[in-house]
């Protein structure tokens, strides 16, 4: 089982949204995915509840509460016993013993960020923290920045400057763009199943097209992440 962790010191950086998108891509590819809800607000648990109500939850995926150390340990053990292909961890903001344990146990670390000065500053702080933690523990875990909510059109001067600041870091080549399909995942449920349901309704063709573009985007990101894991 490969553990992929989404981490950021800043709340609202897009950790949960990025995780949901990647989860949909992996499940759509037939992978079994465990989700570790380590944020005390338990957004993944609420996501699952909403998805079940909308019949957009994939049974190949399961959410485990992991916002305390005993829960995390039990979640990891159970997920391995169940034979999941991947575990995706949604961490809480800031540093903590729990976050450190998740980071140190990971096969890949993803640091989501939007292209604002505050977000980039927090992403850089998170990256430095992760590197220092790995050095102190004598670990070498692949780490990459994932750009979030990138405008579909032209970037502003400020956004271009922020993007250039990331060039010295490992960055997932393809970003997640700012799309309604992504922002609505928490309410609608899993992206690939929402798309499947929309495809049967001829009156929803425009929304279906937007969902399809978003799905294609996370599939590309999923393949890029798989290459990082295989390296």
Curated annotation (Swiss-Prot):
SUPFAM superfamilies: P-loop containing nucleoside triphosphate hydrolases. CDD domains: ParAB_family. The keyword Oxidoreductase does not apply. InterPro entries: DNA_Partitioning_ATPase, P-loop_NTPase, VirC1. Pfam families: VirC1 (PF07015). Keywords: Crown gall tumor, Plasmid. NCBIfam families: PRK13849.1. The Ti plasmid contains at least six transcriptional units, designated vir loci, which are essential for efficient crown-gall tumorigenesis. The translation of virC1 and virC2 may be coupled. This is Protein virC1. It comes from Rhizobium radiobacter (Agrobacterium tumefaciens).
């Amino acid at each position: 089982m490969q553990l992929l962790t989404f981490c950021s010191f800043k709340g609202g950086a897009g950790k949960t949204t990025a995780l949901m998108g990647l989860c949909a891509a992996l499940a759509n590819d037939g992978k079994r995915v465990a989700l570790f809800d380590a944020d005390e607000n338990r957004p993944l648990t609420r996501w699952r509840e909403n998805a079940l109500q909308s019949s957009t939850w994939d049974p190949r995926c399961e959410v485990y509460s992991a916002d305390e150390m005993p829960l995390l340990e039990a979640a990891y053990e159970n997920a391995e016993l169940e034979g999941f292909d991947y575990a995706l961890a949604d961490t809480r903001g800031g540093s903590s013993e729990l976050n450190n344990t998740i980071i140190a146990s990971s096969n890949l670390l993803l640091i989501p960020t939007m292209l604002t000065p505050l977000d980039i500053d927090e992403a850089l702080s998170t990256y430095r923290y992760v590197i220092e933690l790995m050095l102190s523990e004598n670990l070498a875990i692949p780490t990459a920045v994932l750009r979030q909510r990138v405008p579909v059109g032209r970037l502003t001067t400020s956004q271009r400057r922020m993007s250039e600041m990331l060039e010295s870091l490992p960055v997932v080549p393809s970003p997640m763009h700012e799309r309604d399909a992504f922002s609505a995942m928490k309410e609608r449920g899993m992206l690939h199943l929402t798309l499947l349901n929309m495809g049967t309704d001829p009156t929803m063709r425009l929304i279906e097209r937007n969902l399809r573009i978003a799905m294609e985007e996370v599939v590309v990101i999923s393949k890029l992440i798989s290459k990082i894991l295989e390296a």
